[in-house]
Amino acid sequence: MKQLYTVPFERNSERVKELRRQYVQRVMELEANQAPHEFIYIDEAGFNLAKRRRRGRNVIGKRATVDVPGQRGANITMCAAIANAGLLLHRCQVGPYNTERLLAFLNDLHQRLVPEQGQEGENMRTFVITWDNVAFHHLQAITTWFEVHPRLVSLFLPPYSPFLNPIEEFFSAWRWKVYDHQPHDQMSLLEAMDAGSRDITVDDCQGWIRHTRRFYPRCIDLDNIRWLAMAGGRLTSHSGLERYQRALRSVGKSRRPSASRYKAALTNQPEGRRRS
C-alpha cells in the first residue's frame, strides 16, 4: 500500500491549464516590452507558537522531543514582497491581514519603490505586483489603489499553481529559520520572524524566481503538472519524488547498500552498467 495524496480534481483541468498558459504569455509579453519593469511577488503567511519541526535527532533508545508552550497563542501573519533584488519589505501583524492592513503594506511598498512622488512618463520603471488570484485581492479598495498608483500594476497568478510563485519557497525556507529560534512567547516569535527574514539572501530569491520559470515551457504546452513541497522549500514534481523514494526503498532492502547500487536504482538500470 502507498501513501495517498489528496489532489483537487480541477488542479489540471483544461480551464486551469489554459489560465497557466495565458499567465506565462503575459509574463513573456512584459519581458519583450522595451519599457523597463520589475516583477514583485507578494503573499501572506501565518505562524503561531505551536508550530515546530516535525522531525529531529535523538539519543538511541529515547524519543526525539521538543519543548513547546502550553498555549499556541494568537496567530501572527506576515506579508512579504520579494524580487530579484531580494526581500523588499515584510510586515508582521497579530491576526489575519484585512483590507486596511494590506493597503498600508502597499503604501509602504510604493514609498520604497517609487520615492520620487508624482513622477510619471513612458520610460519610468513599472512594478508588476504578482500575487494570488483570491477575492481579497479583487476588492474595490484594492482596485482603486492601483488606479491611483499607475507605476504599480497587478498581475494575478493562475489557480492551483504555487510552483509559479517564488514567494511560496521563500515562506517555506523562512518557516524553518523561525523554528530554529524556538520562540516561547509572542514577543520572541515576532523577533524570530524578523530574524528569519533577514537570513534570506538575494541569491536565494533569485534562485527561487529562476526555478519557477523552469515550469513555463510546460505551461505553454498545457501539460499536466503535479508537484509536492519538499524539505528546504523546493517545489518539485510527484514523479521525481516517487522515483527517489523507490530508489531509497530498493537500496534499503540490500544487505550492502552502496553509492553505485543507489545510482542504479535511481536510473532503473542494473548495477555496473553505464548509461550510453
Residue map of PLM features:
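Major-groove recognition helix of helix-turn-helix-like DNA-binding domains
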Residues: 1-3
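Extended, low-complexity cationic-aromatic segments
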Residues: 17-108, 220-223, 227
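C-terminal anion-handling pockets and recognition modules
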Residues: 36-39, 167-276
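Short, conserved catalytic/metal-binding motifs centered on acidic residues
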Residues: 40-46, 80, 106, 129-134, ...
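RNase H-like polynucleotidyl transferase catalytic core
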Residues: 63-71, 148-166, 183
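Short, basic/hydrophobic alpha-helical segments
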Residues: 102-127
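RNase H-like two-metal-ion nuclease catalytic core shared by retroviral integrases
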Residues: 131-133, 140, 155-179, 187
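Short, aromatic/basic amphipathic alpha-helical patches
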Residues: 139-149
